Amino acid sequence: MLPDAVKKAGYLTVASDVPYPPFEFYDTDGKTILGSDPDIAKALGELMGIQFRLQPVAQVNIIPGLSSGKYDLGLSGMADRKEREAAVTFVDYMRNAGTFLVTADAKHHPMTLPDICGLNVAVQSATTMADDATGQATKCTADGKQAPKVMEFQSQDDAVLALRSNRADVAMVTAGSGAFIMTQAKGQFDMTATYSAGSILGIPVRKDNMQLAKALEAGVQKLIDNGTYKKILTKWGLDKLNSIEKSGINGAIS
């Protein structure tokens, strides 16, 4: 099902927002990329008989890089959203929800988006969480409340660092990431609540490359059906919060 050019080349160039644990992050050597997305890429490569070559790319640069032809696809826990579907085609492969991460001794414990009014909020740029925070800032002002100070960072690690260093009252991250961060931080953080019903996560490809999208959709579904997908997500603590039963194309909820 792969395009002939991909078969001939023997590889696909994959943009991935490293670090974004547990989806992708560096091992202790600072070079090897670990996580659920690299494992999925490896499994897809073995299934298709080609290499998936991951390249670290900031989230904000993934879609522009795809559109320019610099990368063949993105694999980075990216939300499939209607507005993004105007620029790329998504192959849906997971789901996720937003959550609030606070320090264990936090004074504020937001449970819903209106609870962030007046707080210092750390988010990663170009993410659904960043959009949610800035959108809520407008609503806070409209309701006569103090808007949150939204602090945007290039990486999720930097947003969490702002929380750890008390520059932020709360960090807004995905539920899968929040759960992983808590296991690694050993009591430093708490997740107060998931604040959204969740979104579909997709593998973006160029709009004009539907043949590749169809091949990836079939590949993801094969991994789901043969149990490889469940093993990978379970390994990274994502099975309960992030798994789906059926892949698809452009399945954005909003």
Give residue spans per PLM region.
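Extracytoplasmic small-molecule ligand-binding "clamshell" domains
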Residues: 1-74, 226
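Bilobed "Venus flytrap"/periplasmic-binding protein-like clamshell domains
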Residues: 21, 33-46, 78, 97-155, ...
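Short helix-initiation/N-cap motifs at beta->coil->alpha
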Residues: 53-64, 108-109, 147-161, 199
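Periplasmic-binding protein-like
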Residues: 95-102, 183-217, 221, 238-254
